[in-house]
A protein has these predicted regions:
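Short, Lys/Arg-enriched N-terminal segments with co-localized hydrophobic residues
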Residues: 1-3
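Anionic-ligand binding patches
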Residues: 5-8, 15-198
Length: 198
């Protein structure tokens, strides 16, 4: 049996960690998160998703001397010029889903359905302690709803209507979400290149 290898996901978000766990566990890889280690100061001041993910992964890989995967994800709303974008988690308040969702609804109050187009984007960056880097991207297209819909997921999921499924992201099962989500798609793209990187 192959010896368990460890990879660190640069997040403390349990929901996000679970999505990685589901994808990486079948490969016999032990998944840890930043919550398993002493605090690491990470200055996420990038202008793009890839810059932020690279900062997170590099900082953690250097400090922990383990391979690290980091992602930066965001919601890009066309009517808002691509906002909230890299500021998605901190749009109204720091990782306050309710406040962020309320601010988004308010910003789009007068915007008709056909102009409420949006997409979720994820960039995943893997960095090994020797600096070897792997980058993958994923996106899912949709529209912003007028009210919170569905009980699952986190973040903007209840406001994001997935065009190809005809449901909000928060109405999907975990399996359905993994199939179509921006993170699921970025992760599958990442996994296709994983062996070469690993």
């Amino acid at each position: 049996k192959v010896k368990m290898k460890t990879i660190v996901i640069a997040t403390k978000n349990a929901g996000k960690a679970r999505e990685y766990q589901d994808m990486l566990a079948p490969l016999g890889i032990e998944v840890k998160t930043l919550a398993d280690f002493a605090p690491i100061a990470i200055n996420e001041n990038g202008k793009t998703f890839e810059e932020n993910a690279t900062i997170k992964a590099t900082t953690a890989a250097n400090q922990l001397q383990l391979p690290v995967m980091a992602d930066d994800s965001g919601l890009m709303v066309d009517a808002l010029g691509g906002a909230p974008g890299v500021h998605s988690a901190r749009y109204a308040g720091d990782h306050d889903d309710a406040a962020n969702n309320a601010k988004l609804l308010l910003a789009l109050k007068e915007v008709p359905d056909e102009k409420r187009t949006a997409h979720f984007h994820t960039t995943i960056v893997g960095i090994k302690p020797d600096g070897t880097k792997l980058v993958a991207n994923g996106r899912v297209d949709g529209h912003i709803l007028h009210q919170l819909t569905g009980e699952n997921g986190f973040g903007y999921d209840p406001l994001f209507y997935v065009d190809e499924l005809g449901k909000s992201m928060a109405q999907l099962t975990a399996d359905q979400k993994n199939q179509i989500s921006h993170r699921g798609r970025a992760l599958r793209s990442f996994m296709k290149q994983f062996n070469d990187w690993w």
